[in-house]
């Protein structure tokens, strides 16, 4: 199949298996959820009534005081007591096979092509690391919410994009399922397309 280069009156021949496959929603959902779960720190911790510092003595006698009965100052009902179902550090990561991960990326890229959200250009760069230059370039292309993927990370482009809202610049090694679906448009250089095909072959 062929994809049109926006900045040149020509087309780029690409692999049908990478950019023209059916959308597997279940697979994409599973991989995206697993990717997001893997980003969780999982370090939160609370103390149960067994771990809270405090006396084991019964605060007051069982009957005769007129107050509600109580057996411990560490009760979850009490202020500064333990937590009933205390959170503990845990690993939230989920296993995703390479075949599944690559399949999800291919599925997302193919859907981007179908929805006209993938824009292929011969090259994408700015003369200097100036936000103003990149902002004007994106305005000329009618792009706002965009992920820019280049073959090799362009330092000028990277620095120029840092202060722009909803604009991100990555090289091919830096793309992932979440970033590809998070932006309204994805701009990819011809060099990046070839690298993606090699990576997902």
Curated annotation (Swiss-Prot):
Any matching Pfam family: Ribosomal_L4
Annotated spans, Disordered: 44-73
GO MF annotation: an example: structural constituent of ribosome
InterPro entries per the UniProt record, alphabetical: Ribosomal_uL4, Ribosomal_uL4-like, Ribosomal_uL4_dom_sf
Annotated Gene3D superfamilies: 3.40.1370.10
UniProt keywords, alphabetically: Ribonucleoprotein, Ribosomal protein, RNA-binding, rRNA-binding
Biological process (GO), any one: translation
GO CC terms in record: ribonucleoprotein complex; ribosome
Subunit text: Part of the 50S ribosomal subunit.
Function summary: One of the primary rRNA binding proteins, this protein initially binds near the 5'-end of the 23S rRNA. It is important during the early stages of 50S assembly. It makes multiple contacts with different domains of the 23S rRNA in the assembled 50S subunit and ribosome.
Similarity comment: family membership: Belongs to the universal ribosomal protein uL4 family.
Stated name of the protein: Large ribosomal subunit protein uL4
Native species: Serratia proteamaculans (strain 568)
């Amino acid at each position: 199949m062929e994809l049109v280069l926006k900045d040149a009156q020509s087309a780029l021949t690409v692999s049908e298996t990478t950019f023209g496959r059916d959308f597997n929603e279940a697979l994409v959902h599973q991989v995206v959820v697993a990717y997001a779960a893997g980003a969780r720190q999982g370090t939160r911790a609370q103390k149960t009534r067994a771990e809270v510092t405090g006396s084991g003595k019964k605060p007051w006698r069982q009957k005769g005081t007129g107050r509600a009965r109580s057996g411990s100052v560490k009760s979850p009902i009490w202020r500064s007591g333990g937590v009933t179902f205390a959170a503990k550090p845990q690993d939230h990561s989920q296993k995703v096979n390479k075949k599944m991960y690559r399949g999800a990326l291919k599925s997302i890229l193919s859907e981007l092509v179908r929805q006209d959200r993938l824009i292929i250009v011969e090259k994408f760069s700015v003369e200097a690391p100036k936000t103003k230059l990149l902002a004007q370039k994106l305005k000329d292309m009618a792009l706002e919410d965009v992920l820019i993927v280049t073959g090799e990370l362009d330092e000028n482009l990277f620095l120029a994009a840092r202060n722009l809202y909803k604009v991100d610049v990555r090289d091919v090694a830096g793309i992932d399922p979440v970033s590809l679906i998070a932006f309204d448009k994805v701009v990819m250089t011809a060099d990046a397309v070839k690298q993606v095909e090699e990576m997902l072959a």
